[in-house]
């Protein structure tokens, strides 16, 4: 009886079972398509070019679908910032289409020889880039990710399996329908790109545990989403981590330049992962220089958080910092400020509280910048420049699927090469191993 009762308790509702069945069926179909997908570079580029044209040609339909999501978002009380990320208009759709055209211009990584050599016995060995296979994407209310993921997956030879946000349901459905129509017009299966159900969070769990069907899952969104995917997955994941980015101003820095860099990193776009969230001031800086940095931040509309006993002698209107001020992203016009005793204490602070995204330093002393570069734990280190540069396009990689903050497989902005694996090919002339 116990086993019977447990089975009843663990049984899925009909709705939940249908959702799970749909996710697994789509994953199986994606796996079939990926194993048969052999597109050369020209075929990939032609597909992407037609997809870009189709998005612009169907802009009115996309906007109509998007308006449904915006209306629902307003009813649900979404913040203006979320509604802005969700909204599409003709200009934004053209920008998304332009992103696909940019991918066309990128070098196709598939087939690239990473390295090779000939052994003394005449065996010729080479390591060649190959697609990963089925690439799952879990993301929040950014419909542009639907198209970006499609473009990067196709160019790198992968098949995207997309699990977007419920808040962008109608927009994503329309975008994927257009992309599927284009695939069909190229005599390719519509399952070249698929959208998973988004009614419950359980569909995410179905995707990230579909080991053997899905080769990789990449989460893009807030810390809660990323942690849920990374910690709950049995499928390999790449953590596109949050960006609690720091900027250390050394006593050797040009103070006006350093201040400009901090303000750019904080205020250019405060809601992005490469925004500066913490500024660390060298205690050896003269007080007038410290005051100058803090006053300029306030003039730029930034609220200062920190230890009041440390900062009150320098400036007014400081908000007393809590532990979360050091650990969390603000994503707003707020910045945490601490005074540290030199670069070693700055690095120790960063390595304790940072998220391994981007860390910056302003200094003219070579030993100081060298120490920072060597010992700070980060995917990107900005020396005498803004943290805002950590971006695939700015790195010259073209489009990116996210910025990886983990150390295995990929780290930093992920472009096409990071969406591939490799295989070794050994050519011989009948050699047998003794």
Curated annotation (Swiss-Prot):
The keyword Cytoplasm applies. Its main location: cytoplasm. InterPro entries: Ald_DH/histidinol_DH, Ald_DH_C, Ald_DH_N, Aldehyde_DH_dom, G-glutamylP_reductase_CS, Glu-5-SA_DH, GPR_dom. The gene is proA. GO terms for cellular component: cytoplasm. GO terms for biological process: L-proline biosynthetic process. One of its GO terms (molecular function) is NADP binding. NCBIfam families: PRK00197.1 (NF001221), proA (TIGR00407). It catalyses: L-glutamate 5-semialdehyde + phosphate + NADP(+) = L-glutamyl 5-phosphate + NADPH + H(+). Residues 1-26 are annotated as: Disordered. CDD domains: ALDH_F18-19_ProA-GPR. This is Gamma-glutamyl phosphate reductase. Belongs to the gamma-glutamyl phosphate reductase family. It is an enzyme of class 1 (oxidoreductase). Residues 16-25 have a biased composition (Basic and acidic residues). Catalyzes the NADPH-dependent reduction of L-glutamate 5-phosphate into L-glutamate 5-semialdehyde and phosphate. The product spontaneously undergoes cyclization to form 1-pyrroline-5-carboxylate. It is found in: Cytoplasm. The keyword Transcription regulation does not apply. Its EC number is 1.2.1.41. Keywords: Amino-acid biosynthesis, Cytoplasm, NADP, Oxidoreductase, Proline biosynthesis.
């Amino acid at each position: 009886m116990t086993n019977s009762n447990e089975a009843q308790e663990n049984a899925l509702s009909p709705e939940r079972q249908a959702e799970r069945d749909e996710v697994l069926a789509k994953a199986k179909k994606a796996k079939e398509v990926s194993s048969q997908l052999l597109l050369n570079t020209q075929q990939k580029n032609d597909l992407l070019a037609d997809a870009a044209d189709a998005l612009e040609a169907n802009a009115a339909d996309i906007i109509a679908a998007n308006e449904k999501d915006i209306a629902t978002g307003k009813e649900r009380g979404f913040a203006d910032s979320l509604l802005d990320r969700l909204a599409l208009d003709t200009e934004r759709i053209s920008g998304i289409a332009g992103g696909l055209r940019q991918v066309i211009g990128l070098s196709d990584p598939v087939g690239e020889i990473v390295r090779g050599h000939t052994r003394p016995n005449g065996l010729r060995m080479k390591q060649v880039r190959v697609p990963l296979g089925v690439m799952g994407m879990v993301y929040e209310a950014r419909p542009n990710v639907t198209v970006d993921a499609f473009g990067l997956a196709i160019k790198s030879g992968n098949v995207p399996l997309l699990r977007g946000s419920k808040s962008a349901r109608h927009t994503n459905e329309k975008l994927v329908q257009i992309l599927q129509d284009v695939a069909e017009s190229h005599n390719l299966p519509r399952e070249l790109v698929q959208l998973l159900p988004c009614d419950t969070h359980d569909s995410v769990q179905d995707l990230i545990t579909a080991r053997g069907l899905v080769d990789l899952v990449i989460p893009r969104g807030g810390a809660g989403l990323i942690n849920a995917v990374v910690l709950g997955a049995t499928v390999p994941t790449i953590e596109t981590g949050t960006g609690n980015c720091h900027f250390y101003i050394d006593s050797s820095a040009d103070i006006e330049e350093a201040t400009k860099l901090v303000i750019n990193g904080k205020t250019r776009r405060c809601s992005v992962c490469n925004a500066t969230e913490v500024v660390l001031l060298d205690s050896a800086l003269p007080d007038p220089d410290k005051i100058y940095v803090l006053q300029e931040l306030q003039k730029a509309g930034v609220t200062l958080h920190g230890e009041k006993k440390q900062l009150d002698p320098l400036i007014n209107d400081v908000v007393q910092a809590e532990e979360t001020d050091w650990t969390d992203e603000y994503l707003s016009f707020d910045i945490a400020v601490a005074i540290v005793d030199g670069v070693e204490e700055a690095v120790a602070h960063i390595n304790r509280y940072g998220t391994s995204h981007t860390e910056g330093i302003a200094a003219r002393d070579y030993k100081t910048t060298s120490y920072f570069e060597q010992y700070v734990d980060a995917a990107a280190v900005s020396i005498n420049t803004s943290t805002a540069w950590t971006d695939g396009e700015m790195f010259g990689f073209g489009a990116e699927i996210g910025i990886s903050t983990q150390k295995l497989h990929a780290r930093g902005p992920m472009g096409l090469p990071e969406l591939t694996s490799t295989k070794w090919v050994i050519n011989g002339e009948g050699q047998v191993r003794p």
